[in-house]
Amino acid sequence: MTTSTVKTNLLGLTQPEMEKFFDSIGEKRFRAGQVMKWIHHFGVDDFDAMTNVSKALRDKLKAIAEVRGPEVVSEDISSDGTRKWVVRVASGSCVETVYIPQGKRGTLCVSSQAGCALDCSFCSTGKQGFNSNLTAAEVIGQVWIANKSFGSVPATVDRAITNVVMMGMGEPLLNFDNVIAAMHLMMDDLGYGISKRRVTLSTSGVVPMIDELAKHIDVSLALSLHAPNDALRNQLVPINKKYPLKMLLESCQRYMATLGEKRVLTIEYTMLKDINDKVEHAVEMIELLKNTPCKINLIPFNPFPHSGYERPSNNAIRRFQDQLHQAGYNVTVRTTRGEDIDAACGQLVGQVMDRTRRSERYIAVRELNAADDLPQIAVNRI
């Protein structure tokens, strides 16, 4: 009876983990840096292509290791230049990765889970429930796939991916260890060399893990707020029943204090018609955030079938924004991108749609918005 050896996937190993791996097979630690550059800088998954590695070591690696990212199921490009990849992970589920170009900046929105357990009422991802956590290789693999698609070398002036946001499918803090490992690779010069200021983790408010985050990594933090009081947030973001606003904001303040350098929290606020878009909500928000240095990103709701919510009018959004501006806040309104390929914020559901169905979906969305189309007020890419 023969037994097959489970190969180590090198794609998700951080530098210390890679060095430990080479130690364990009797090789010098500097090999870790060589192999990491081939994997992350040049997108190589074939050990024979690693020409500065000896043939003997290449043969050894082929027997015990692999470089395996998620399977690309589809890649779509929006009319506005936004790209969306649907990738299949080991659990069999599909997740989505979105690239948003804007001038010299290219932001990659990365998923951390297949599905999501938090069940935010306005988010299409939450409607499908939780399926699985992604491995570190599956999280960083989304960056690897996108980078290979562009043929871009990280840490160069003309690289395609300048920013990464953990704002795709799932709650990153509920897949803590794998997300931390992937973010370290994003920032490592042997990985993707992205500045800590340009890597952002977005959370709905898992308070104990926000406190834990500061012990492990230094990245920008965004809070999915969406409501200015506990009663409303309990309805929109059910985890608020466990970690109410006072507790949540105090944890964010503690985290931001560890960063220093005058960095501020980003507040994300999805605007829902007649639910949280009134001036009195803005007034409540001003009072709520008075002790929290922050910038505010208003996100007009992106419709999806059977959501039960609508996007507010242009005037309602402007009134809300003006109220916050008058209180001294830096407020932007996010421009919807990738709507024709279901890549807009809140629309990620991990499904593969054929072109006819996607076209029908886009027409329906345009009709929903035609009566009161929102012009570009400002653009914020975190």
From Swiss-Prot:
Binds 1 [4Fe-4S] cluster. The cluster is coordinated with 3 cysteines and an exchangeable S-adenosyl-L-methionine. It is found in: Cytoplasm. GO terms for biological process: rRNA base methylation; tRNA methylation. It catalyses: adenosine(2503) in 23S rRNA + 2 reduced [2Fe-2S]-[ferredoxin] + 2 S-adenosyl-L-methionine = 2-methyladenosine(2503) in 23S rRNA + 5'-deoxyadenosine + L-methionine + 2 oxidized [2Fe-2S]-[ferredoxin] + S-adenosyl-L-homocysteine; adenosine(37) in tRNA + 2 reduced [2Fe-2S]-[ferredoxin] + 2 S-adenosyl-L-methionine = 2-methyladenosine(37) in tRNA + 5'-deoxyadenosine + L-methionine + 2 oxidized [2Fe-2S]-[ferredoxin] + S-adenosyl-L-homocysteine. One of its GO terms (cellular component) is cytoplasm. Its cofactor is [4Fe-4S] cluster. Coiled coil: none annotated. Signal peptide: none annotated. The active site is at E96, C345. [4Fe-4S] cluster binds at C116, C120, C123. Disulfide bonds join C109-C345. Its EC number is 2.1.1.192. InterPro entries: Aldolase_TIM, Methyltransferase_A, RlmN_N, RNA_MTrfase_RlmN, rRNA_lsu_MTrfase_RlmN/Cfr, rSAM. Belongs to the radical SAM superfamily. RlmN family. Reaction proceeds by a ping-pong mechanism involving intermediate methylation of a conserved cysteine residue. PANTHER family: 23S RRNA METHYLTRANSFERASE, RADICAL SAM CORE DOMAIN-CONTAINING PROTEIN. Specifically methylates position 2 of adenine 2503 in 23S rRNA and position 2 of adenine 37 in tRNAs. m2A2503 modification seems to play a crucial role in the proofreading step occurring at the peptidyl transferase center and thus would serve to optimize ribosomal fidelity. This is Dual-specificity RNA methyltransferase RlmN. It comes from Pseudomonas fluorescens (strain SBW25).
